[in-house]
Regions:
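Flexible, acidic/Gly-rich N-terminal and inter-domain linker regions that tether
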Residues: 1-104
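Conserved Radical SAM active-site core
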Residues: 91-95, 101-110, 115-168
Length: 168
């Protein structure tokens, strides 16, 4: 019977520290992995170059890193970027970056579909299917950040924290 690997980004820093201790390793390895996942946006264990190959292989044995894929991107002449984002389960959401003269706004999806019936909104025509996981919200911001060359000063960790709190 095949075992399904757990998405490592569903673990808290404390969970990661405890995992490494159970494996007979130092707890600080959990801090290193957490930093790779949430500050450096690593999508592969091989990217975690300050970990030994053995440690990376052990992580690969126990976990996966589910991530999104920008399936289509549209850029308008005013600089707006709209991404159709494919989630790890194949569902699609959208994220948009809207630059103006005074500020730049990033709109990211927090759920697939919507339970409201706003007439002006295309998403409202979709049946609400599920809330996004914190990592799926985070990945949308990372994707927008990479495309726009914007520098988001610490909002990624704040967004992640908010998403975890909201999840409970």
């Amino acid at each position: 019977m095949a075992t399904t690997k757990k998405d490592i980004r569903a673990l808290t820093k404390k969970d990661l520290r405890e995992f490494f201790e159970r494996q007979g390793d130092k707890a600080y390895r959990g801090n290193q992995v957490y930093e790779w996942l949430w500050q450096k946006a690593a999508y592969s264990f091989d990217d975690m170059t300050n970990l030994s190959k053995e440690t990376r292989h052990m992580l690969e044995t126990h976990f996966v890193i589910n991530n999104i894929e920008v399936s289509t991107m549209q850029r308008s002449s005013d600089g707006t970027i709209k991404n159709a984002v494919k989630l790890h389960d194949g569902l699609i959401v959208e994220s948009v970056l809207i630059p103006t003269a005074t500020r730049t706004t990033a709109c990211v999806s927090s759920q697939v579909g919507c339970s409201l019936d706003c007439l002006f909104c295309a998403t409202a025509r979709l049946k609400r299917m599920r809330n996004l996981n914190p990592d799926e919200i985070y990945d949308q911001v990372v994707a927008i950040d990479k495309e726009s060359k914007l520098y988001f000063k610490r909002p990624l960790s704040i967004l992640c924290l908010w998403a975890w709190v909201n999840r409970s």
